[in-house]
Amino acid sequence: MENTMWEIEDQNYEAGFKIICGVDEAGRGPLAGPVYAAAVILPPHAQIPGLNDSKKLSDKRRRELFPVICQQALAYGIGIATETEIDEINILQATFLAMERALAQLKVQPDLALIDGNREKDFGLPVKTIVKGDSLSANIAAASVLAKVSRDDFMIAQAEKYPQYGFDIHKGYGTRAHYAALEQYGVCPLHRMSFLKKFYEQK
């Protein structure tokens, strides 16, 4: 991991914050499955080689980093919001709910949360949003990996229950194969109906 991944944290340490966590989500875009979020507090300048935005890493590399992050972290938490909650309160609010649940699992209380993106929410502690934070902040990058691997594992497990959809391959995203399965089999309980309105309106 390059030292540049600690620049944002360093600025905030210098501003007086002592315990900084990173927060990121996985699964905002899929047609099926929950949205996951993770919150991670790494020790200052923890060196985790190859840590970067999880979207830029191979699945193999993410899985190698997952236990390293969990081992090195001062604290971490993983939260989800279900597909039912996504349909009820919309994906943005459900993402915030998953983040809130991840933060609630932290066994160490942070005094600042760095959150990937540009949407702020009151989580009961100081928050700073960082666009592309998953490639700029070590803590957000670590959270990105935990959220992505956790969600992928969940969707792979669901493929055993609903083998006709190929969740182990596309993880619920709107691939051609996924839409073809929807045409043939209809929806299952994992599908986000609010994401499928246009699909069914066109039929």
Tell what function each PLM region has:
Residues M1-K203:
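RNase H-like, Mg2+-dependent phosphodiesterase core
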